[in-house]
Swiss-Prot record:
<feature type="modified residue" description="Phosphothreonine; by MAPK8">
    <location>
        <position position="183"/>
    </location>
</feature>
<keyword id="KW-0009">Actin-binding</keyword>
<keyword id="KW-0112">Calmodulin-binding</keyword>
<feature type="compositionally biased region" description="Low complexity">
    <location>
        <begin position="178"/>
        <end position="200"/>
    </location>
</feature>
<feature type="modified residue" description="Phosphoserine">
    <location>
        <position position="48"/>
    </location>
</feature>
<keyword id="KW-0963">Cytoplasm</keyword>
<feature type="modified residue" description="Phosphoserine; by PKC">
    <location>
        <position position="104"/>
    </location>
</feature>
<feature type="modified residue" description="Phosphoserine; by MAPK8">
    <location>
        <position position="120"/>
    </location>
</feature>
<comment type="subunit">
    <text>Binds to filamentous actin (F-actin), but not to monomeric G-actin, independently of its phosphorylation status. Interacts with calmodulin.</text>
</comment>
<feature type="compositionally biased region" description="Basic residues">
    <location>
        <begin position="86"/>
        <end position="98"/>
    </location>
</feature>
<protein>
    <recommendedName>
        <fullName>MARCKS-related protein</fullName>
    </recommendedName>
</protein>
<dbReference type="GO" id="GO:0008283">
    <property type="term" value="P:cell population proliferation"/>
</dbReference>
<feature type="compositionally biased region" description="Low complexity">
    <location>
        <begin position="16"/>
        <end position="26"/>
    </location>
</feature>
<feature type="modified residue" description="Phosphothreonine">
    <location>
        <position position="85"/>
    </location>
</feature>
<comment type="similarity">
    <text>Belongs to the MARCKS family.</text>
</comment>
<feature type="compositionally biased region" description="Low complexity">
    <location>
        <begin position="156"/>
        <end position="165"/>
    </location>
</feature>
<keyword id="KW-0206">Cytoskeleton</keyword>
Length: 200
């Protein structure tokens, strides 16, 4: 593709030439936007050309964005600081143990016992407790649903272990149990009855 000037008829004036020739465009603006291809001088050096073509705009700095004086910044931070002070990050305490995604969350007595402020709840802790009570209802329902299949699984493992010990130590009876792959879950990953018999 070529540039627009190559496609323009000879008699027509291109947009760049019209912008350069127009007296309104003498300040470096093109279609209402300032051109930034090196035509403008840096603001730090000497006088800059007037933005609107008038000398009044260059002298007036009331519309320019200025940094706030330090006293106003301190006042603004002073307003925010009291709000941030009571919102200290606190450790979340669970009143009831629950399971979420197979993980068990239980209250740790060591953390709660050493802290004297934990024995007398403050207003914020009471509000947090009310908010957590609402969220605990949803997690408790999820925990019950997750706990039922997991609680049945350890009972089944216990039944298999007791059946294996009652039947005896024969290799023929241990064969079917060894053929069934069992996946250990969580802290109950002790030796399975089949592996215990093989070790003997």
């Amino acid at each position: 593709m070529g540039s627009q000037s190559s496609k323009a008829p000879r008699g027509d004036v291109t947009a760049e030439e019209a912008a350069g020739a127009s007296p309104a465009k003498a300040n470096g603006q093109e279609n209402g936007h300032v051109r930034s291809n090196g035509d403008l001088t840096p603001k730090g050096e000497g006088e800059s050309p007037p933005v609107n073509g008038t000398d009044e705009a260059a002298g007036a700095t009331g519309d320019a964005i200025e940094p706030a004086p330090p006293s106003q910044e301190a006042e603004a931070k002073g307003e925010v600081a009291p709000k941030e002070t009571p919102k200290k990050k606190k450790k979340f305490s669970f009143k009831k143990p629950f399971k979420l995604s197979g993980l068990s969350f239980k209250r740790n007595r060591k953390e709660g016992g050493g802290d004297s402020s934990a024995s007398s709840p403050t207003e914020e802790e009471q509000e947090q407790g009310e908010m957590s009570a609402c969220s605990d209802e949803g997690t408790a329902q999820e925990g019950k649903a997750a706990a039922t299949p997991e609680s049945q699984e350890p009972q089944a493992k216990g039944a298999e272990a007791s059946a294996a010990s009652k039947e005896g130590d024969t290799e023929e009876e241990a064969g079917p149990q060894a053929a069934e792959p069992s996946t250990p879950s969580g802290p109950e990953s002790g030796p399975t009855p089949a592996s215990a018999e093989q070790n003997e």
